């Protein structure tokens, strides 16, 4: 194989992730790579919440078109931004080792969520984060916050918010870990499906490339991500509903924790299940939660 072209978004975090994959391909597979950057609709439309403009697929469409048009061979994404159902002909070819999956509380004035005064303004556009925050602290005011990591931090620093919630993984990768005031316990805020995992997307028809990329695959990330995504798929969850799922692997046993909540955080359902088949485990836990009224909670 002469060279692999990797499609990437333009943000610093996206390029960190893409360069991480590029370096692994070059060093471990001995295949030269180039990066092709592009803006996606999700990067351009910043004045509306994602759930109002088409969801997470808006961060991927342009990259997928580049692959279909032979302008790129693979694309690199944050798995939490990848919908549970990919367009026909695409697949997830390789999962990278997981970074810290927890949400991060970032504030210049307060040390933790518990320290926030009544009525404090917290920035996040994630319905999952909003619902869990309001469930824990219903006296907070949650305001939308879009943009890349640097944009969000500058809005906090300008005094627009008392605190903001980001993914710990992104801050760690950008060497901004000192900005994290509190790693939010999963008991308070269960992470998004796939949070902390970088994934490689490829075309199903490209068997030779898939075989090579598979050599980079992290088995643990692949298994926990499969369980989380199977849960999400069974519930048909996107960014328009408050769903969280987080799996841990111990030997061959997977512990899957999941949460669904109403958007105001007043109703919340949490369950966990243990199993060794990730797809089956995700589906079974979703079915159990559906039987317990998950859909009614998500619709309220």
Curated annotation (Swiss-Prot):
Its EC number is 2.5.1.61. It comes from the Bacteria. The keyword Transferase applies. Keywords: Porphyrin biosynthesis, Transferase. SUPFAM superfamilies: Periplasmic binding protein-like II (SSF53850), Porphobilinogen deaminase (hydroxymethylbilane synthase), C-terminal domain (SSF54782). It catalyses: 4 porphobilinogen + H2O = hydroxymethylbilane + 4 NH4(+). Monomer. Belongs to the HMBS family. The porphobilinogen subunits are added to the dipyrromethane group. This is Porphobilinogen deaminase. The lineage of its organism: Bacteria, Pseudomonadati, Pseudomonadota, Gammaproteobacteria, Thiotrichales.
């Amino acid at each position: 194989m002469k060279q692999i072209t990797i499609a990437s978004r333009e943000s610093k975090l996206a390029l960190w992730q893409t360069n991480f994959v590029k370096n692994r391909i070059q060093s471990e597979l001995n295949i030269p790579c180039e990066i092709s950057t592009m803006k996606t609709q999700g990067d351009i439309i910043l004045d509306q919440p994602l759930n109002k403009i088409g969801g997470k697929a808006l961060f991927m469409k342009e990259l997928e078109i580049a692959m279909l048009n032979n302008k790129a061979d693979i694309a690199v994404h944050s798995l939490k931004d990848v919908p549970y159902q990919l367009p026909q002909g695409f697949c997830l070819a390789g999962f990278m080792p997981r970074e810290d999956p927890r949400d991060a509380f970032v504030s210049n004035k307060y040390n933790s969520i518990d320290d926030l005064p009544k009525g404090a303004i917290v920035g996040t556009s994630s319905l999952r984060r909003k619902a869990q925050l309001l469930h824990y602290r219903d006296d907070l005011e949650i305001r939308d916050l879009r943009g890349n990591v640097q944009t969000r931090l500058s809005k906090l620093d300008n005094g627009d918010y008392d605190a903001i919630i980001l993914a710990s993984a992104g801050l760690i990768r950008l060497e901004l870990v000192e900005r994290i005031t509190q790693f939010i316990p999963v008991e308070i805020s269960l992470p998004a499906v796939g949070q902390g995992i970088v994934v490689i997307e490829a075309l199903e028809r490209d068997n030779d490339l898939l075989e090579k990329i598979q050599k980079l695959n992290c088995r643990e990330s692949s298994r926990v991500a499969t369980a989380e995504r199977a849960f999400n798929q069974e519930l048909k969850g996107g960014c328009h509903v408050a769903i969280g799922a987080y799996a841990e692997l111990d030997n061959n046993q997977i512990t899957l924790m999941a949460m669904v909540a109403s958007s105001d955080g007043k109703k919340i359902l949490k369950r966990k299940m243990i199993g060794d088949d990730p797809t089956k485990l995700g589906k079974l836990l979703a079915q159990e939660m559906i039987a317990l009224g998950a859909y009614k909670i998500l619709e309220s």
